[in-house]
Amino acid sequence: MSELSAEEKRKLLRERRQAKMAQGKATDRLNNILSQGSSVKSSNVTSVLDKPEKATTTVMDLPSRETQSPTPLHDDPEVPDITSLLKEKENEAPDMEAMLQQILGGSGAHTGPGNDGGANFLQEMMKAMAEDPSGGSTAEESSYQSQLSQYHAYEQKQWKARFLVVRWIIHTLNFVYHYIASGYKLSASPYAFVRAQAVDSHVRTFFTAFLTVEVAVISAYFLVMSQPKFKDFSRENLVSRILSMASAVVPAVGRYQPLVTRALVYWNGASIFVGDLMLMVFYFGITSVLGN
């Protein structure tokens, strides 16, 4: 019989030890080992292999398949019934401003601190829809403001018509007077040498009176239109509304809005001069045709 190797001996020794432990002698062996030491006083030691195991979970404690809630296939929380939310909100009046602020809140979050582009956009939208952003205006106040705006528009058109009639009457009388005083010679000549001659005194006084009337009429026009009611209404034209809506999308456009409004006011004065000048050209054309 061949000799066992060291590895086989250790294996047999381990199997014998496990067999003894399985027979319930683990506690005796442990006490025997501990009794040989001088530091251990107690011999009532029980091995963990001889301790009976207590069942931590019984069959009754296990949840049945019927009572166990199914595990969701995703990690999202369960969504509550939307009908309960609708029942809670059905008696509440909808706040359009709050809803728009919530919608615009996400876009305003990444515009940087201190940026109120969402609030400006909301205010411009409210103004474009002719609503009060504070939400405190009643139907009677809105109707009154609408009627007042219409009255100011009518009054502004009435003043423009008055200036138009006064200008035409004054310029017509000025032209007729100098035409008769010049011996019916106040007309345009088709010949270059005639136009190159010295200006007649009647022609000079005619144009002096024309320019004087223009300066007086345009100054009076600006003075009347500078009233607050007309000044505020002049900002409600189509160009100003387009710029107001564009500034809500592109805030840089808002800085040019006062300049455009001022340019429109100056254009009204320039249009008065151009219109009166075209009227004089028409009169000179008639006299030239009749003179020939």
UniProtKB/Swiss-Prot annotation:
Biased composition (Basic and acidic residues): 1-18
Listed Polar residues bias regions: 29-47, 55-71
An example Gene Ontology CC term for this record: endoplasmic reticulum membrane
Predominant cellular place of this UniProt entry's protein: endoplasmic reticulum
The protein's name in its UniProt record: Golgi to ER traffic protein 2
Record topology, Cytoplasmic segments: 1-158, 226-268
One record GO biological process: protein insertion into ER membrane
Signal peptide span: none
TM segment ranges: 159-179, 206-225, 269-289
Membrane topology per record: Multi-pass membrane protein
Location relative to the cell: Endoplasmic reticulum membrane; Golgi apparatus membrane
Assembly and interaction partners: Component of the Golgi to ER traffic (GET) complex, which is composed of GET1, GET2 and GET3. Within the complex, GET1 and GET2 form a heterotetramer which is stabilized by phosphatidylinositol binding and which binds to the GET3 homodimer.
Superkingdom assignment: Eukaryota
Organism: Clavispora lusitaniae (strain ATCC 42720) (Yeast)
Region of interest (Disordered), residue spans: 1-80
Alphabetical UniProt keywords: Endoplasmic reticulum, ER-Golgi transport, Golgi apparatus, Membrane, Transmembrane, Transmembrane helix, Transport
Family under the similarity heading: Belongs to the GET2 family.
Pfam family, one: GET2
Lumenal side: 180-205, 290-292
Job description of the protein: Required for the post-translational delivery of tail-anchored (TA) proteins to the endoplasmic reticulum. Together with GET1, acts as a membrane receptor for soluble GET3, which recognizes and selectively binds the transmembrane domain of TA proteins in the cytosol. The GET complex cooperates with the HDEL receptor ERD2 to mediate the ATP-dependent retrieval of resident ER proteins that contain a C-terminal H-D-E-L retention signal from the Golgi to the ER.
